[in-house]
């Protein structure tokens, strides 16, 4: 948890979220879409391994030039939706393009897109796009990525990408596509449940 969570204003925001927003969200988890982005690159490799007792583990890891990309997706109670990769870091224009072309077509009237409180996410154009679909943005309290269950899904994606060791952009695309198909409805439900957004 970020050290800033101890600040009075952030602590109060988090308390209000837990006591007022989450109980309401648990009543209709099918309307929730948790959005976030994370980096993926062509140098990802396993960070840990096993070896015989008393022997040092030696592995090869890429060094030098690599390509970093941004992976964006939404997590619903039954699926990982609208996965997308962009070349480079997230920008306001890329975020708006993602919302308009990838995420918005998957939304239904009454859906709530929950996301981090980042400057690039505060786009009037993206908000208007959601409004036309009958959906809206709801920003998490500041410094609170732990309240977004998609972080757990990203952890799984990165673990599989390290195992895949994709060294080209095309290989990275294929690996991410294969990994996105691994998310079962029960697993997605469990992510929401663990974060307090769904009940038994």
Place the predicted regions along the sequence by residue:
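Short functional hotspots at interaction and active-site rims
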Residues: 1-200
């Amino acid at each position: 948890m970020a050290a800033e969570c101890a600040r009075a204003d952030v602590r109060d925001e988090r308390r209000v979220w837990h006591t007022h927003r989450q109980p309401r969200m648990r009543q209709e988890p099918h309307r929730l879409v948790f959005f976030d982005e994370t980096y993926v690159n062509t140098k990802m490799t396993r960070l840990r391994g096993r070896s015989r007792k008393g022997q040092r583990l030696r592995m090869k890891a890429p060094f030098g030039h690599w390509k970093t990309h941004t992976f964006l997706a939404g997590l619903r109670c039954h699926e990982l939706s609208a996965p997308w990769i962009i070349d480079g870091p997230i920008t306001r224009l890329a975020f708006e393009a993602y919302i308009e072309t990838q995420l918005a077509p998957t939304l239904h009237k009454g859906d709530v897109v929950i996301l981090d409180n980042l400057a690039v996410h505060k786009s009037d154009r993206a908000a208007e796009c959601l409004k036309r679909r009958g959906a809206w943005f709801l920003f998490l309290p500041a410094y609170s990525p732990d309240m977004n269950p998609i972080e757990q899904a990203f952890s799984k994606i990165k673990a599989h990408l390290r195992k895949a060791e994709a060294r080209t952009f095309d290989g990275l695309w294929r690996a991410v596509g294969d990994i996105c198909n691994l998310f079962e409805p029960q697993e997605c439900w469990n992510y929401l449940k663990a974060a307090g957004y769904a009940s038994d």
